[in-house]
Amino acid sequence: MGKRLISQRRGRGSSVYTCPSHKRRGEAKYRRFDELEKKGKVLGKIVDILHDPGRSAPVAKVEYETGEEGLLVVPEGVKVGDIIECGVSAEIKPGNILPLGAIPEGIPVFNIETVPGDGGKLVRAGGCYAHILTHDGERTYVKLPSGHIKALHSMCRATIGVVAGGGRKEKPFVKAGKKYHAMKAKAVKWPRVRGVAMNAVDHPFGGGRHQHTGKPTTVSRKKVPPGRKVGHISARRTGVRK
């Protein structure tokens, strides 16, 4: 009998595949959406900017005038000691947090809420930003980095600016070991080896005098055992469309 596939070992959840969440700085989200923000604004001071191994962008530790503390995804151009504003009457300035309905069209934003008060879900990776396209009553249309246009409630909050850390891809990894440790910080097993390059004991497509699958690559979704479910799973068609 052959060995278990990587997908089977990942499903068991050993330490290799378990996310090292104990190394994370914490959850980066907005403070609760209360009446102070809905009718005015709350001030906060950036007391530190931290590196988070689980993210592609740094996070800022913020102390609010209400006595609360929290982490926020940090934009380009802010520094320790800066004052940020959260609320409907906040100034249109990078780092400030406003409802989408209070942000003018064409302004770049990030860390966008999908439901008012959820803390921010969209556009959080380093160097990313979305654009406010138009306002239509209680709806605001936002163009995401993928090009998709999404309609959101106008009371969903967003941060003005561009996420910091956008130049991370300009520096090459150079060595395979650097890439390995970068992936390990995010619980991603790397490198990813092709099945035909493995031995027969490790994968159904492995083994042989030359690299070939040796069997059909399309398998049923329900009629194959777990160790054989590789390749095109229940595909309607394969190959180049003619």
From Swiss-Prot:
Keywords on record: Ribonucleoprotein, Ribosomal protein, RNA-binding, rRNA-binding
Chain positions covered by the region annotation Disordered: 201-242
GO MF term list: RNA binding; rRNA binding; structural constituent of ribosome
Bias-annotated ranges (Basic residues): 220-242
Biological processes per GO annotation: cytoplasmic translation
Gene Ontology annotations for the cellular component aspect, listed alphabetically: cytosolic large ribosomal subunit
Entry superkingdom: Archaea
Pfam families, sorted: Ribosomal_L2, Ribosomal_L2_C
HAMAP family with a match to the protein in the record: Ribosomal_uL2_A (MF_01320_A)
Protein family: Belongs to the universal ribosomal protein uL2 family.
Job of this protein: One of the primary rRNA binding proteins. Required for association of the 30S and 50S subunits to form the 70S ribosome, for tRNA binding and peptide bond formation. It has been suggested to have peptidyltransferase activity; this is somewhat controversial. Makes several contacts with the 16S rRNA in the 70S ribosome.
Subunit relationships: Part of the 50S ribosomal subunit. Forms a bridge to the 30S subunit in the 70S ribosome.
Name assigned to this protein: Large ribosomal subunit protein uL2
Gene: rpl2
